[in-house]
Amino acid sequence: MSNPEKAKNFDLMAFIGRNSKEIRWPEIKASAQELKKKYSKVGAIGYCYGGWACLKLAAEPSLIDAVSTAHPSLLDKAEIDAVKQPVQILAPENDFAYTEELKKYTLDTLPKTGVSWEYIYFPGLQHGFAARGDPNDPKQKEGLERAKRAGVNFLAGYLH
């Protein structure tokens, strides 16, 4: 969040309560279904909160053709297990949400799915780097730019 005043007053737990998976998944799924009616190929990029949704989409081939996520949050092992479409994960070194345990699980599990996947590690960067990294900090700026290029290139490979 770029506005320090809003960031200070942001109540994460209230946000998650108002936007739980149970509340938002039906809306996300319906949106993907509508897009698939209009377009032959559909992709999704989800940063942070959108990460779990991308992996749930990737479990349903009729909904999506490929997904990319950076520093996913609220992700669980079952969502990783269920992947059936190409997935890209952009993982910072330091992430309270996409934990070391989940990173290891991802790297152990995705090769067994038979699905095309890509995992890109961003050393020295934190959760949120791809969405709200500091463009005035050279390391964070590089991460922002690299993540953007990686996501676009990954999806372009599956959507054209």
Predicted regions located by residue number:
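N-terminal cap/leader regions of alpha/beta-hydrolase-fold enzymes
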Residues: M1-H160
